[in-house]
Amino acid sequence: MTFGDWPPQRRIGLTGGIASGKSSVAALLEKRGCPVLDADVYAREALATDTSASKAVVARYGKRVQKDGTSDIDRAELAAIVFNDPNERSWLEQLVHPIVQRRFDDALRSLPDAPIVILMIPLLFEAGLEKWCSEIWVVRCTALQQRERLMARNNCTEAEATQRIAAQWPIDIKVQRADSVINNSGRIDDLHDQLDALL
């Protein structure tokens, strides 16, 4: 589907650095009546037990990426592999991204009358999906906040958090490519004000 095929609709690509607060922003937008399509949800579904993608992951990495006694993918173990090796990360992205894109396509086709749809895509720029969006919003916070939030959320070390942040494009590059930038380093009231202005 090309942008010219779409109905008149604001398709807002919501992206930003890992642990910058994209989900918090998306939740506020959803409360304002905007449907939110989440790439992370689609990626998790793509790697659900016994899907073709999960079988390909097990075939490549073996039982070490399976939770003990189950066929489920151990996402923490898989993350440890791909964040330590750019080649493996690229392989996984090439496996999962086409599946995620098909899910987005199907979901967008089901929402022709929605005036605004939010496409929450952490790797929007990295995956070259700008063409899917009529505008792009980048969520950012301070580097210290990002690292501390990631460590708390993922229960990881500072070194692991730094590694995961470095695996994505630098936030300054994303900001340069954004139509709008949302500063999520302050109070929740400030966040509400920014969203009200953008909508």
From Swiss-Prot:
Q: Which residues bind ATP?
A: 19-24
Q: Which UniProt keywords apply?
A: ATP-binding, Coenzyme A biosynthesis, Cytoplasm, Kinase, Nucleotide-binding, Transferase
Pathway the protein contributes to: Cofactor biosynthesis; coenzyme A biosynthesis; CoA from (R)-pantothenate: step 5/5
Instruction: Tell me which family the UniProt entry assigns to this protein.
Output: Belongs to the CoaE family.
Q: Which organism is it from?
A: Synechococcus sp. (strain CC9902)
Listed name of the protein? Dephospho-CoA kinase
Sum up the protein's function in the record's words.
Answer: Catalyzes the phosphorylation of the 3'-hydroxyl group of dephosphocoenzyme A to form coenzyme A.
Q: Does the keyword Kinase apply?
A: yes
